[in-house]
Amino acid sequence: MIKELMNMKEIKNGVWPVMITPFTADNQIDYDAVKAIIDWYVENGVAGVFAVCQSSEMFFLSKEERLSLAKCCIDYCHEKGVGVVVSGHVAEAVEDQIAEAQAIIDMGADSYVFISNQFGAPEDSEEVVKERIEYLLSRIECDSFGIYECPYPYKRVISPELLKWIASTGKFAFLKDTCCSLDQLKAKCEAVKGTALKIFNANGATLLESMRMGVAGYSGVMANFHPDLYAWLCEHYADEDKQEMVQEMMDYLGAASTIECQVYPINAKYHMNLVGVPMTLVSRTKNPELLTCGVPVKCDGDAFPSSKIMEIDQFCAVEKIMRKYFFG
């Protein structure tokens, strides 16, 4: 295990956005916008990027698109000096999963991230999951893996007991946790103590308390809206002289995180335009009219934007107020 830990790339503490995929008007991946998003992440203090995940609409990308997107993100993140972990673990056949994982690893990802629900059907026991993880590890050449408790097509939350075993393999460095339970997070932090496996919380409301328990940072939807605010919290959560501001930031981030229940990821794509990262609202998972209601985003004359568009406009305005309050 010592040799494996020496070869494992560092997964830095902090913010790891779940990267959205921008598309052109004719529904192709917009690689110029992909790079612009990464630039924006880096400018806003992220530790790394989680690419080709559910927010990336990976279930709606072809194999060729998943691999092409992975290579673009890996190469550009390396160029920008920021970490990158990659999934794309959606193939049905296990041998196809192995081949695709190896291809992404060979591109230079810091860690290849398995989807936990791909380890077995909902009714399968954790013993079955262990056997399947062991098989994958025996077939894939890689020093660093991760796991994402992806909620689609069903959510398989890793138990603290299983996580302890996973960490003991010495092969895992990253867990994107979606349990949203402080009791479970506390037990999971205990389970990985003293190992290389770091837990990243996907839930905004529980983030502060979970970091006090040992969680390494945030990897969730809201890093597509204000990664800088999450980065500030991750950096200062333990500062004794800032605890009042830390709690105020947490209160804002927890309340603001409810916007992900609106029309994500389309609202995130619209928000990107508001902060200077242009892209279409095209998505393969939702109709943009769920956000726009068929009304042009920029209205002239007697037309008015949809209420959901106005919500994101107002959301962005409040973000600016919060930045002024916290950063001056």
Give names to the regions the model predicted:
Residues 42, 209-328:
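Structured C-terminal cap/extension of enzyme domains
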Residues 49, 85, 112, 174-175, ...:
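A local structural micro-motif
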Residues 69-70, 132-133, 194-195, 237-239, ...:
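Short alpha-helix boundary/capping motifs
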